[in-house]
Amino acid sequence: MRKTLTALMLSLPLLTPHMAFADESSVLKAKLTEIATLKAKFEQTVTDINNKQIQKGSGIFALAYPNQFYWHLTAPDESLIVADGTDVWIYNPFAEEVSVMDLNQAISASPIALLVHRDEETWSQYSVTSDNGCFNIKPKSIDAGVESVKVCFDDKTLTEMVLQDQQGNVSQFTLSEQTAIDDAERAMFKFTVPDDVDIDDQRLNAIN
């Protein structure tokens, strides 16, 4: 979801649709490659299939290559998602519960995977088209829980993400105060399990 048309597409109008998708995918990958680390505030709005607002929220979002992700919803209710490069930890303070799963298991079915994965195998699972400064990402598998993801840039800065699920709900995340992450802040990608919480270990190699 970014860039209207690449220079290659403009100069070669007889490109096949398959080649166009491949080119737009490479443009998006190049954009994301320039973002080695990112930390930003976000404002979230969720609407249902009838465009009725069903949720608002705000928090902190961060990512670092490779395979590190941080999502801290601070309002209206707190929740935390941390991908440390190997596992994904999901913490619900209100329920006093932590869920943990393998990174690939957690994000392989979501276009969000492209934010932290750069391997060809992962990228081959999605089609990418561009539209007026944004890139639309759709999984090729009909079993994916997310219908599509739109990511938008202002030059090299990631400014917006829009997720649509298979029920027609749309989550829009507007980013602000984007900065690179310094060495001291990388600790945010390490999750420490709080005392006195239930742990739901869904990792494939978990010992039951």
Curated annotation (Swiss-Prot):
GO terms for cellular component: outer membrane-bounded periplasmic space. Residues 1-22 form the signal peptide. Its main location: periplasm. It holds the Pfam family LolA. HAMAP family: LolA (MF_00240). Monomer. This is Outer-membrane lipoprotein carrier protein.
